[in-house]
Protein backbone atom coordinates (compact mmCIF):
# COMPACT_ATOMS: atom_id res chain seq x y z
CA UNK A 1 0.00 0.00 0.00
CA UNK A 2 1.48 3.36 -0.90
CA UNK A 3 2.00 5.98 1.80
CA UNK A 4 -0.63 8.42 0.56
CA UNK A 5 -3.36 5.76 0.49
CA UNK A 6 -2.29 4.53 3.93
CA UNK A 7 -2.43 8.01 5.47
CA UNK A 8 -5.73 8.83 3.78
CA UNK A 9 -7.38 5.69 5.13
CA UNK A 10 -5.85 6.24 8.56
CA UNK A 11 -7.26 9.77 8.69
CA UNK A 12 -10.67 8.49 7.56
CA UNK A 13 -10.80 5.91 10.36
CA UNK A 14 -9.52 8.37 12.96
CA UNK A 15 -12.18 10.89 11.87
CA UNK A 16 -14.84 8.20 12.17
CA UNK A 17 -13.71 7.45 15.72
CA UNK A 18 -13.70 11.15 16.67
CA UNK A 19 -17.16 11.61 15.14
CA UNK A 20 -18.55 8.72 17.17
CA UNK A 21 -16.93 9.97 20.38
CA UNK A 22 -18.48 13.39 19.83
CA UNK A 23 -21.93 11.94 19.15
CA UNK A 24 -21.80 9.71 22.24
CA UNK A 25 -20.68 12.67 24.35
CA UNK A 26 -23.51 14.80 22.94
CA UNK A 27 -26.06 12.08 23.64
CA UNK A 28 -24.90 11.63 27.23
CA UNK A 29 -24.10 15.19 28.30
CA UNK A 30 -26.64 17.26 26.43
CA UNK A 31 -29.52 14.83 26.70
CA UNK A 32 -30.12 15.24 22.99
CA UNK A 33 -32.98 13.13 21.76
CA UNK A 34 -33.35 12.74 18.02
CA UNK A 35 -36.99 11.88 17.23
CA UNK A 36 -36.15 8.94 14.95
CA UNK A 37 -33.49 7.71 17.42
CA UNK A 38 -35.31 7.59 20.75
CA UNK A 39 -33.35 4.53 21.91
CA UNK A 40 -30.29 6.30 23.33
CA UNK A 41 -28.57 3.11 24.50
CA UNK A 42 -29.19 1.48 21.14
CA UNK A 43 -27.78 4.52 19.35
CA UNK A 44 -24.70 4.53 21.62
CA UNK A 45 -24.25 0.81 20.93
CA UNK A 46 -24.33 1.44 17.17
CA UNK A 47 -21.75 4.20 17.52
CA UNK A 48 -19.50 1.94 19.62
CA UNK A 49 -19.76 -0.73 16.92
CA UNK A 50 -18.71 1.78 14.26
CA UNK A 51 -15.77 2.85 16.46
CA UNK A 52 -14.70 -0.77 17.01
CA UNK A 53 -14.74 -1.44 13.27
CA UNK A 54 -12.64 1.66 12.57
CA UNK A 55 -10.14 0.72 15.31
CA UNK A 56 -9.92 -2.82 13.90
CA UNK A 57 -9.15 -1.43 10.45
CA UNK A 58 -6.41 0.80 11.86
CA UNK A 59 -4.91 -2.19 13.69
CA UNK A 60 -4.94 -4.32 10.53
CA UNK A 61 -3.33 -1.55 8.50
CA UNK A 62 -0.59 -1.11 11.08
CA UNK A 63 -0.02 -4.86 11.33
CA UNK A 64 0.27 -5.53 7.61
CA UNK A 65 1.35 -2.27 6.03
CA UNK A 66 3.80 -0.61 8.42
CA UNK A 67 7.37 -1.64 7.64
CA UNK A 68 8.99 -1.61 11.08
CA UNK A 69 8.25 -1.14 14.77
CA UNK A 70 9.56 2.43 14.85
CA UNK A 71 7.01 3.40 12.20
CA UNK A 72 4.20 1.69 14.13
CA UNK A 73 4.95 3.83 17.17
CA UNK A 74 4.84 7.04 15.14
CA UNK A 75 1.40 6.25 13.74
Model regions and ranges:
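Extended, charge-rich alpha-helical interface modules
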Residues: 1-75
Amino acid sequence: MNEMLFRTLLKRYEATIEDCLYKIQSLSENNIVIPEHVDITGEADKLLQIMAEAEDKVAVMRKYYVKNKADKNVL
